[in-house]
Curated annotation (Swiss-Prot):
It comes from the Bacteria. PANTHER family: L-ARABINOSE ISOMERASE. It catalyses: beta-L-arabinopyranose = L-ribulose. This is L-arabinose isomerase. It comes from Salmonella typhi. The lineage of its organism: Bacteria, Pseudomonadati, Pseudomonadota, Gammaproteobacteria, Enterobacterales. Homohexamer. Keywords: Arabinose catabolism, Carbohydrate metabolism, Isomerase, Manganese, Metal-binding.
Length: 500
């Protein structure tokens, strides 16, 4: 079972009574056929549920009102099978608070050249019915997605499925609770921000809990539960000699297991699906949570270090969006650069907390090594390299008057040399279009040093995310040129300033 099983998407057909009962009967018949086929063959993440035809203002308004109040409804897919006068949609769309996609399709793929007549023309009017609907969306400044293509086309299936992921993610985000263990890392700017504005814009709430509250739960974990979790570690990872039975760091592994079990219990009891820690506020914990955080991220929790609640929330959102897709998604930080003419590279990592979902196939190494930052006992962590291939890094920042999403398209590469003294998981990548352009654009746009790294999602997914939440997006990819990028930032200042 996945999060998508908790939701459904309503399929709504727009028409009108002008064409008579027989035409409406055929429209209904076509709709049933299309919905059944999409549910069976399109590999959509959510089930489509066909609703009654929308043929009058009252019917359409009722559907939109019901969608708002049905917690299982993640959004609406609308198909204008015939011409559906768009003034009928104004009241419904004005109250709709769920994501909306217009599927610009028709029942037949090819025109029946020899038999086409006016009955056929009146029945299959998406070509101009869809434009009428599009006008009222533009007139009302109604944000909605549009997918054009035949309902049997695999590309259309893929695009509808991607939108469904956004719709479900948006509903999940409205219920998301972010727990900050301790506060922000002292004097750090980008990890701070307006939590009230974030809840208004995205729906997630952010609150702080004292580390002592967590420690109380951690200390209540029994030895039997710890031993059972250690058994899971033994089967899942390659343990270094120091962490094996009778190793001199075995007790550190047991303490890491205790922290993991305590953290998970605390998060479950509070209904939290994202959290932060900071190494400046660990009072009562024997070590910085490393292994615990890595494993919780792999289970779908959002996380970021140093109290960075925006990145923690974004990671959870992107985890939901990517559920069931190939590739992983993790908290990440641009840590250090490799400057070599024609082969500039970025080494991404964090002190400990990189999600194993992005790891290469072989078992991660479980080790305990010294960590100077934080002043605690040596923490346990998983060490691994990252899968290669196309990926993205994304950052959500608070500009005071709005949110900006930055996305850099990257290409992860194999580490050319072993890293025998680096005791943390890492990812190595080439930034698009090149490191100087990418880093300068990122810095000029105010991008954070913390990011969400993903092999599973791509730029199109993040564009949809920005659109569905009505926030600014700044893209850095192979098409980026700094003068044009700077111009776009200036234009966005004007656009969003006027939009306020």
């Amino acid at each position: 079972m996945t999060i998508f099983d908790n939701y459904e998407v309503w399929f709504v057909i727009g028409s009108q009574h002008l064409y008579g009962a027989e035409t409406l009967r055929q429209v209904t018949q076509h709709a049933e056929h299309v919905v059944n086929a999409l549910n069976t063959e399109a590999k959509l993440p959510c089930k489509l549920v066909l609703k009654p035809l929308g043929t009058s203002p009252d019917e359409i308004t009722a559907i939109c009102r019901d969608a708002n109040y049905d917690d299982r409804c993640a959004g609406l897919v609308v198909w204008l099978h015939t011409f559906s006068p768009a003034k009928m949609w104004i009241n419904g769309l004005s109250i709709l608070n769920k994501p909306l996609l217009q599927f610009h399709t028709q029942f037949n793929a090819a025109l029946p050249w020899d038999s086409i007549d006016m009955d056929f023309m009146n029945l299959n009017q998406t070509a101009h019915g869809g434009r009428e609907f599009g006008f009222i969306g533009a007139r009302m400044r109604q944000q909605h997605a549009v997918v054009t293509g035949h309902w049997q086309d695999k590309e259309a299936h893929t695009r509808i499925g991607a939108w469904m992921r956004q719709a479900v993610s948006k509903q999940d985000t409205r219920q998301l609770k972010v727990c900050r263990f301790g506060d922000n890392m002292r004097e750090v700017a980008v990890t701070d921000g307006d939590k009230v504005a974030a809840q208004i814009k995205f729906g997630f709430s952010v609150n702080t809990w004292a580390v002592g509250d967590l420690v109380q739960v951690v200390n209540s974990i029994g030895d039997g539960d710890i031993s059972a979790l250690i058994d899971e570690y033994e089967s899942s990872y390659t343990l270094t000699p120091a962490t094996q039975i009778h190793g001199d760091k075995r007790q550190n592994v047991r303490e890491a297991a205790r922290i993991e079990l305590g953290m998970k219990r605390f998060l479950e009891q509070g209904g939290f699906h994202a959290f932060t820690t900071t190494f400046e506020d660990l009072h009562g914990l024997k070590q910085l949570p490393g292994l615990a955080v890595q494993r919780l991220m792999q289970q779908g929790y959002g996380f970021a270090g140093e109290g960075d609640w925006k990145t923690a929330a974004l990671l959870r959102i992107m985890k939901v969006m990517s559920t069931g897709l190939q590739g992983g998604t993790s908290f990440m930080e641009d840590y250090t650069d490799h400057f070599e003419k024609g082969n500039d590279l970025v080494l991404g990592s964090h002190m400990l907390e990189v999600c194993p979902s992005i790891a290469v196939e072989e078992k991660p190494i479980l080790d305990v090594q010294h960590l100077g930052i934080g002043g605690k006992e040596d923490p346990a962590r998983l060490i691994f390299n990252t899968q290669t291939g196309p990926a993205i890094v994304a950052s959500l920042i608070d500009l005071g008057d709005r949110y900006r999403l930055l996305v850099n398209c990257i290409d992860t590469v194999k580490t050319p040399h072993s890293l025998p003294k680096l005791p943390v998981a890492n990812a190595l990548w080439k930034a698009q279009p090149d490191l100087p352009t990418a880093s300068e654009a990122w810095i000029l746009a105010g991008g954070a040093h913390h990011t969400v790294f993903s092999h599973a999602l791509d730029l199109n997914d993040m564009r949809q995310f920005a659109e569905i939440h009505d926030i600014e997006i700044a893209v850095i990819d192979n098409d980026t040129r700094l003068p044009a990028f700077k111009d776009a930032l200036r234009w966005n200042e004007v656009y969003y300033g006027l939009k306020r």
